[in-house]
Amino acid sequence: MNNATPARACGIDFGTSNSTVGWLRPGEETLIALEDDKITLPSVVFFNIEERRPVYGRLALHEYLEGYEGRLMRSLKSLLGSKLIKHDTSVLGTAMPFKDLLGLFIGQLKSRAEAAAGREFEEVVLGRPVFFVDDDAAADQEAEDTLVEVARKIGFKEVSFQYLSLIHI
């Protein structure tokens, strides 16, 4: 890629509290607005029982705080490397694998970024901590493998990682 060509890949920082998506374009802001012209999306999903749908980010928090009946799920990143990732949770009366829950949220990041960019992204660079799980190399590798699996399932054909401590935006 030369400096006059937009990058083919997007970068996703899937955070415990908030997430961001970046796309390198000449002369443009790197971070993409994901919700209400804001570059962050709270890493939250609310399953609204009344309307039988998931909502994400600030809208999820709003509906929860307004008293809609449902289930709020936060800190989704903490599933990575945990034993829970191999299990299901009850969502809107059905069993949902935790991996699918991650896919819903990361898929939402992808679709919002694509809508804002006016193009599809088939390549992604995912930010990752130095260790998803301290002192457990197998769990750390499983966390990374899970992210690759989820990213491919939602449509990314190429997946790579960048340690977050090295990212400078």
Report each predicted region and the residues it spans:
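Short hydrophobic/aromatic segments of transmembrane alpha-helices and their interfaces
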Residues: 2-4, 151-152
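Gly/Thr-rich phosphate-binding beta-strand-loop-beta motif of the actin/hexokinase/Hsp70
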Residues: 3-31
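Phosphate-binding loop and its immediate beta->loop->alpha context
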Residues: 27-157, 162-163
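Conserved small/polar residues in nucleotide/adenosyl-binding loops
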Residues: 167-169
